[in-house]
Amino acid sequence: MAWYLRRVRAMEAEKRTTPTMTLLRWMVGLLSPYKLEVVLLIILSAAYIGARTLTPYVGKMIVDEGIIAGDRGKMLYFTLVYVGLTLLSWLTRMFRTYFSGRLNSELLYVMRSRAYEHLCRLDLAYISRQQAGRIISLITNDVSAVGNVVTSENIDLMINMLTIVGSVYIMSKMHVWLTLAALSVLPLLVGVTLVFARKTRQVYKTTREKVSLLTSSVEQSVYGARVSQAFTERRKIDYRRFSRISRESVRANLKAAMVTALINPSLSTIRAIATAIIIFYGGLLVTRNELTVGSLIAFYNYTGLFYQPIIMVATFYNVLQSALASAERVYLFLKEKPGIEDSPEAEDREILDGEIVLENVHFSYDGSKVFEGLNLKIRSKSTTALVGHTGAGKTTIANLILRLYDPQKGRVLIDGVDIRKYTIKSLRRQVSLIPQEPVLFQGTVLDNIRIGNPEATRENIEKTIDELGLKEIIESLPDGLETKVKPGGENLSVGQRQIISFLRTMVRNPKIIVIDEAMSSVDPFTEHKLQEAILRLARRRTCIVIAHRPTTVRVADEIIVLKHGKVVERGSHSMLIARQGEYARLYSQLLRQ
């Protein structure tokens, strides 16, 4: 249900309408770093347009001045000119296509890199509101749609517009009235285009929304394959949801296909009408000696040269509507301000002691209150366990300390300094999180550990492993540190993945470590090894452990019990057990589990 509500909120937010001119200015502005490439493409396009528009006129000269006049010399001359123009048209089109494709590839690379970097800067609050499939679709499909229109489609539009102007000019020089007759169907062409254009933007926007929802559904099914296969009911629910979204996607695509199916035949019919007018009226002019045969042939050729660009210009409007839907999503995404940024007073600071204080903290998720005036102090260079039922605020405290979120009111202090006065980079370099579900990447175990500190040498990593007493576990792997890791670490046990995640954090040499349910799924042997490592760490670092297991909680120097966002008890394990309060009840429940 929560997933569905997040989806609805995301779709409602995307219904915001950005002015078309704003989007067009932004799209054109994307080309500003590529001025030389654009100039080269304009020169190639101009040469292509000149060769293309002159070719039918030279064909006229071959017929009138060569064949009909019986002048072999002129016939040979104009034929050679015709071949030269055709060759020039072919060469300029080839080079234009190549350079346009190269510009398109470069622009897509820059846009995707920019979008990805922006995604990495956005805060957890924004990312948690979005679907992974929607973001993936934006960075891949939407960026491609925008890039294609800005480069190749935009250049094609310019060529088509200039081809229309050049063709009309030459046609009018040959015969004004026949030119006007050829243009007589233009109002009908414009009218048909405008009728269909009204619906296209929303239709294409809907299709892209459905594609992103379909991507999210597949992604969720892949990630949850183990659960779906274990619970046949869940598999049925996933299948029904996928089928529903897939049917909606089919319906949206059918609507888009219907628009396209109606536009292209309509435009082709109008072109056929224009051709018929030229042949009939032009034929009458030829019989009255008001037009040469060569000119009639040229007019016929110009019809194809003239109306094809008009059809493409009209179609471009529909392509543009599709691209504008994508552009709006990318534009709004890049305009999204990170909720967590460095404040003007932020400095690179060193954490010396590691004492943490939450002072009168108020915090809520989407209007649901978690803390109202929470005051909490965590001693430095000690291990503090946070316990409480689900929803008590344990993980929220971890997120606030890491500054993944900011409190709506109150402060979080480290060594007496508001963490907003630390730069985000310096804070997270010294405060590290070990999550419940470790994320491993394809490569070796050594590569995955080195993510925590790319500068760490193998000798330093081996020393850290030895100091933490984890050498036995690493050596038990098939190739030790050189063991290959499959995507997600699927070839390793949960315990092995968690050990690697733990070591990744430790090579950073953080001053504060937050361990969020990291031992909830590991085996007893791995848990024991991690507990020993934590005890070694606590001598010189501040450790915060969020856990449910009794053995994990018991080794903490101090235990803080949370209930409904408030601290209800704190003290050592033995002290709290003797008090027979909230902790004793929780501990008893944990033992029974």
Language-model features: locations:
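Membrane-integrated ABC transporters
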Residues: M1-R52, I67-F78, R96-S100, N104, ...
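Short intracellular "coupling" helices and adjacent cytoplasmic loop segments at the cytosolic face
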Residues: Y4-K15, A69, S105, S113-S137, ...
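Alpha-helical segments in transporter systems
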Residues: R25, L36-Y57, M61, F78, ...
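Transmembrane helices of ABC transporter permease
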Residues: P33, E37-G50, Y82-L85, S152-T206, ...
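Hydrophobic/aromatic residues in alpha-helical transmembrane segments
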Residues: T55-G59, R96, A115, G166, ...
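An intracellular "coupling" helix at the cytosolic face of ABC transporter transmembrane type-1 domains
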Residues: L124-A125, N141-V150, N154, L162, ...
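Cytosolic ends of transmembrane helices, especially the final helix of ABC transmembrane type-1 domains
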Residues: M258, L305-F333
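ABC-type nucleotide-binding domain
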Residues: D342-S343, R349-Q593
